[in-house]
Design a protein with these regions (language model features):
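Aromatic-lined carbohydrate-binding surfaces of glycoside hydrolases
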Residues: 1-100, 104-115, 183-188, 259-263
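General secondary-structure edge motif
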Residues: 37, 148-150, 221-224
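Catalytic-core region of carbohydrate-active enzymes that cleave or remodel glycosidic bonds
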Residues: 118-203
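Pol beta-like nucleotidyltransferase catalytic core
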Residues: 189-291
């Protein structure tokens, strides 16, 4: 298919690593839930299982030759109230991941300052705190909470607000971008399936369009949303910026991007033609310097 990198599911529950995720095993030939949200994260039984599971998983990934191309997670979106619990959960398995990339989406810089997380992925409305602190090789993400000022790709948002993310990622040399909602066709907590053609907000739990970027098509093939097409244009903008940079310099490209004012994750031209005209200029500059 062409997949090069692989993301492994979180080993503890979202928002603080308080519990075990749902784990189903074959017991005497029958499927049975052996751990779940009723299991404490520090449970000796769960930690023993988890350590055995991780050891086997890493062996399997090594046999496949992809162990260094995997991203591992502890818990999704912990906050400062979860520092102690998250740290305890991570320490229970961290020795198994020496030399591997362990990262989590989180927006409190205290996790980084205290050395609890070495590779944070902050949200776009908080990432500048990490940039200003000097964190290197940053990734960033957005989801249902990033609805003020910053770029996002909700159905209700104009396309320029979607596409502008390319200039943000380029300016701050962001190494990766994370987004959860590719094809989540369920309501909150996955209690029932929804029809994304008719119900665009996950049955009232997320802004319309947040939970998916493609629609289900014939024979299981995805149908691209306009939002995904525009987001792809943002990625192509980055490629164009990088190409011009290779012919000139980073500062040269940024002078063009910020010709009408400074660009930040929260500050950018709120008009349709800005990014289109910018791309025309960049394309012309590439042609000029490629002669």
């Amino acid at each position: 298919i062409g997949f090069e990198y692989f993301e492994i599911s979180h080993f503890f529950t979202q928002w603080g690593a308080l519990h075990a995720p749902k784990v189903i095993a074959s017991v005497n030939g029958r499927k049975k839930k052996i751990f779940g949200w009723d299991t404490d994260a520090s449970s000796e039984e769960y930690i023993k299982f988890l350590r055995d599971f991780i050891s086997c998983l890493l062996t399997h990934l090594k046999n496949l030759g992809i162990e260094k191309k995997c991203f591992f997670h502890i818990s999704d979106e912990p906050n400062e109230k979860n520092l102690e619990g998250y740290n305890k959960a991570k320490k229970s398995i961290s020795d198994l991941f020496d030399g591997y990339l362990v990262t989590d989406a989180l927006s409190s810089i205290e996790f980084y300052k205290k050395g609890i997380v070495n590779f944070p992925i902050p949200s776009t409305d908080k990432v500048e705190d990490f940039i200003n602190y000097g964190v290197k090789d940053l990734w960033t993400y957005y989801c249902c909470g990033q609805y003020l000022e910053v770029s996002n790709r909700y159905i209700a948002m104009p396309s320029y607000r979607n596409r502008i993310i390319g200039t943000h990622l380029y300016k701050y040399n962001i190494k990766g971008f994370l987004h959860w909602g590719y094809n989540f066709y369920y309501n909150q907590y996955s209690r029932k399936l929804i029809n994304p053609f008719l119900i665009t907000d996950g049955d009232f739990f997320a802004p319309s369009g947040d939970a998916y970027s493609v629609y289900p098509g014939d024979k299981g093939l995805p149908v691209k949303s306009l939002r995904l097409v525009i987001f792809n244009e943002a990625l192509q903008d980055i490629r164009a910026f990088k190409k011009l940079e290779s012919l000139t310099s980073y500062d040269y490209v940024m002078n063009i991007i910020e010709n009408h004012g400074e660009i930040t994750f929260k500050k950018y031209p709120r008009k349709t033609d800005y990014i289109i005209e910018l791309r025309k200029i960049v394309n012309n500059e590439i042609s000029k310097f490629s002669v």
